[in-house]
């Protein structure tokens, strides 16, 4: 299972800001957007293309377009916070949704919503900011496969080794793109050092 941890200094600098507990929700959103833009570049650099022609004001020129439609699939709710750059940068992108709610006592997520288009001959791109135990991502990837998705890609901001291993065992074909591979999980199955609850910090709902 390919795992790509970004080594770009701008990603590392933005990640420092995300980790800082004094970062405001407004600042957090800006930093997350920067990181996702870089990770999206890395996750799409090898997309299949098709060659054609385009008419410029002066003459015809060779042109390249993306061969297969990309379907962005954010995991609710935190995945919504990293959807923006994907919609702006990818041509002809469609969006599916998977709603997963984590039980803080068991760290197991339940599916409460799903709306996926047909994924045959498309490129599934799973958006889930934190890859902790891997349970939620594995469930989401199960649904993606059931909808016909093959060779999915996943963008997360921070990953834990436990989550990577879980996906490697259950979905070895998935390609993971992340800003950081952290030390591991604590007793509550939160990533450490991590950056806290991504959704709460993004949407300003920390208690």
Where do the model's predicted regions map?
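PRPP-associated nucleotide enzymes
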Residues: 1-207
